[in-house]
Amino acid sequence: MSDRLKPLIGTAATRPLTREEAEFAFECLFEGEATPAQMGGLLMALRTRGETVDEYAAAATVMRAKCHKVRAPHGAIDIVGTGGDGKGTLNISTATAFVVAGAGVPVAKHGNRNLSSKSGAADALTEMGLNVMIGPERVEECLMEAGIGFMMAPMHHPAMRHVGPVRAELGTRTIFNILGPLTNPAGVKRQLTGAFSPDLIRPMAEVLAALGSEKAWLVHGGDGTDELAISAASKVAALEGGQIREFDLHPEEAGLPVHPFEEIVGGTPAENAQAFRALLEGAPGAYRDAVLLNAAAALVVADRAPGLREGVEIATESILSGAAKAKVALLARLTNAA
């Protein structure tokens, strides 16, 4: 038990913690020095009052420092969502990652099992024949050889074992629900990140700015998803050069049609993998257009495309040329190599 943490729990309930106070508090959590009651008390005090940018940044800083790091190629990007939107869509960010990698941009994707759908990124990749339970060294090999690597959160954040049981018992959202996209083990400086609430995109952009990100789009779909929506306008907070610009983005701005939300609702990992394979073969429809929209945004963030319409063209070529499909096959081979 940490006696030094106890007063901070009461403090957190009444005022924002300074960055130094918050870093100390999360150091206690990640070192296993806090009791389950102290962990729960701190997390709920923050949740009830509302976490600040400094508190998010402090937690992310400590979590990054304790993770198993990965070296990524220059210019690597992460394409990730917080999860937790409860919408059960097809695996859009996962498919987007392979399309972007097929366009020549290194993708260091951080992810986990299902949070907001029946099939999270790791579930879909496993169904596609990839081994996601690999360590940092193997991920580095994938990034260098294939230009894409998947970092399974539990394989890179061992300190989370101390707080996992408490999170499960609390059964409610805490600060940890948004830390995943802020704690990429490869330390990427560019990312396309979705949030389960529009109220999070500005604070998350401010956190990434404080942590040294160069360019990022934080997005929330108008259909309630943690990605750019193909059925409605989306909210965007774009970080570049330390400045944050907020705007609405409609699919038609990228030259794409609007589709009913129901057309991107997913199912089991096997069903989602089947849809993913069809997309890689060039099947048209709402799923492909949703992936093209998100891939276009990622290509803009990566400075691979000057605008969304050009990004859609590049992403379309990645699919139709077979480049995205080839990335899946190569990553499957590399992750299953003896």
Swiss-Prot record:
EC class name: transferase
GO terms, biological process: L-tryptophan biosynthetic process
Cofactor binding remark: Binds 2 magnesium ions per monomer.
Residues reported in the UniProt entry to bind anthranilate 1: 81, 112
A GO molecular-function annotation: anthranilate phosphoribosyltransferase activity
Cofactor entry: Mg(2+)
Binding site for Mg(2+) 2: 226-227
Highest rank taxon of the organism: Bacteria
Catalytic activity: N-(5-phospho-beta-D-ribosyl)anthranilate + diphosphate = 5-phospho-alpha-D-ribose 1-diphosphate + anthranilate
GO CC annotation: cytosol
Pathway field: Amino-acid biosynthesis; L-tryptophan biosynthesis; L-tryptophan from chorismate: step 2/5
Record's keyword annotation contains Transcription regulation: no
Residues that coordinate or bind anthranilate 2: 167
Protein residues bound to Mg(2+) 1: 93, 227
Residues annotated for 5-phospho-alpha-D-ribose 1-diphosphate binding in this entry: 81, 84-85, 89, 91-94, 109-117, 121
Family classification: Belongs to the anthranilate phosphoribosyltransferase family.
NCBIfam families according to UniProt: trpD (TIGR01245)
Subunit structure of this chain's protein: Homodimer.
Function: Catalyzes the transfer of the phosphoribosyl group of 5-phosphorylribose-1-pyrophosphate (PRPP) to anthranilate to yield N-(5'-phosphoribosyl)-anthranilate (PRA).
Protein's UniProt name: Anthranilate phosphoribosyltransferase
Organism field: Cereibacter sphaeroides (strain ATCC 17025 / ATH 2.4.3)
Lineage: Bacteria, Pseudomonadati, Pseudomonadota, Alphaproteobacteria, Rhodobacterales
